[in-house]
Swiss-Prot record:
Entry's Gene Ontology cellular component terms: chloroplast; mitochondrial large ribosomal subunit
Disulfide bonding pattern of the chain: none
Protein name listed in UniProt: Large ribosomal subunit protein uL2cz/uL2cy
Start and end residues of each stretch annotated as Disordered: 1-22, 225-252
Family note: Belongs to the universal ribosomal protein uL2 family.
Family annotation (SMART domains): Ribosomal_L2, Ribosomal_L2_C
GO function terms (MF aspect): rRNA binding; structural constituent of ribosome; transferase activity
Keywords, comma-separated and alphabetical: Chloroplast, Plastid, Ribonucleoprotein, Ribosomal protein
Cellular compartment(s): Plastid, Chloroplast
Gene Ontology BP terms: mitochondrial translation
Native organism: Barbarea verna
Membrane-spanning ranges: none
InterPro entries referenced in this protein's UniProt entry, alphabetically: NA-bd_OB-fold, Rib_uL2_dom2, Ribosomal_uL2, Ribosomal_uL2_bac/org-type, Ribosomal_uL2_C, Ribosomal_uL2_CS, Ribosomal_uL2_dom3, Ribosomal_uL2_RNA-bd_dom
Plastid keyword on record: yes
């Protein structure tokens, strides 16, 4: 991804840094309208998730996370922008006439061929079970449950690494630094997700943030005591506590939120690094 800088004629162009324009011309049979789930509200209209609302209308692209078109070669026809994720997507034309979207692997270009199945070549964009991959392979779009489709390492620039295979399980190092076990029969896609420079983007102005459906974030220390535990005081005052808390008084910034008795606790060998 190439970062594009504008001529500094306004504050928004001076501070903004956007990626090169990748056009989107989705196929009608691979898109459908998506309800935005109340923009952070529940069925009664009460805010349950803050800082959400507004945003441009979107059409959801059906992404093939399962990669279950076995032993059928496909060709990359287009590389498109997807408003629902920070990674690009590819339109694949398969040999049997079917067309699907997949996540764009880093380095893939229009005209490349991909295939899914067992014992397929270890090539960027190919999908196969972990048991058929050599150790050290860089992978993304990893299944947790067999046949459910990829659920791990799907964001732009994400990549995991196969570090061991023993018995019925494979050991993976995830992008977060977590090391966990997954069934060797689960499939994954070879390579890294594209658009690796997405973290270099700068929106440059508040309006661009609103287009993404993200509302402004206000610090608790500038609120009144009735609105936040950090609020109040004369002038610029500290929070008045040993540790920061949420608007509802629960510990924030560092407290672990994962359930201790979750079913997958035994599959995690090393928790993610901070």
């Amino acid at each position: 991804m190439a970062i594009h800088l504008y001529k500094t004629s306004t504050p928004s162009t001076r501070n903004g840094a956007v990626d090169s324009q990748v056009k989107s011309n989705p196929r009608n049979n691979l898109i459908y309208g998506q309800h935005h789930c109340g923009k952070g509200r529940n069925a009664r209209g009460i805010i349950t998730v803050r800082h959400r609302g507004g945003g441009h209308k979107r059409l959801y692209r059906k992404i093939d996370f399962r990669r279950n078109a076995k032993d059928i070669y496909g060709r990359i026809v287009t590389i498109e922008y997807d408003p629902n994720r920070n990674a690009y997507i590819c339109l694949i034309h398969y040999g049997d006439g079917e067309k699907r979207y997949i996540l764009h692997p880093r380095g893939a270009i229009i005209g490349d061929t991909i295939v899914s199945g067992t014992e397929v070549p270890i090539k960027m964009g190919n999908a196969l079970p972990l048991t058929d991959m050599p150790l050290g392979t860089a992978i993304h779009n990893i299944e947790i449950t067999l046949g459910k489709g990829g659920q791990l390492a799907r964001a732009a620039g994400a990549v995991a690494k196969l570090i061991a295979k023993e018995g019925k399980s494979a050991t993976l190092k995830l992008p977060s630094g977590e090391v966990r076990l997954i069934s060797k029969n689960c499939s994954a896609t070879v390579g890294q997700v594209g658009n690796v420079g997405v973290n270099q983007k700068s929106l440059g102005r508040a309006g661009s943030k609103c287009w993404l459906g993200k509302r402004p974030v206000v610090r608790g220390v500038v609120m009144n005591p009735v609105d936040h535990p950090h609020g109040g005081g004369e002038g610029r005052a500290p929070i008045g506590r040993k540790k920061p808390v949420t608007p509802w008084g629960y510990p924030a910034l560092g407290r672990r939120t994962r359930k201790r008795k979750k079913y997958s606790e035994t599959m995690i060998l090393r928790r993610r690094s901070k």
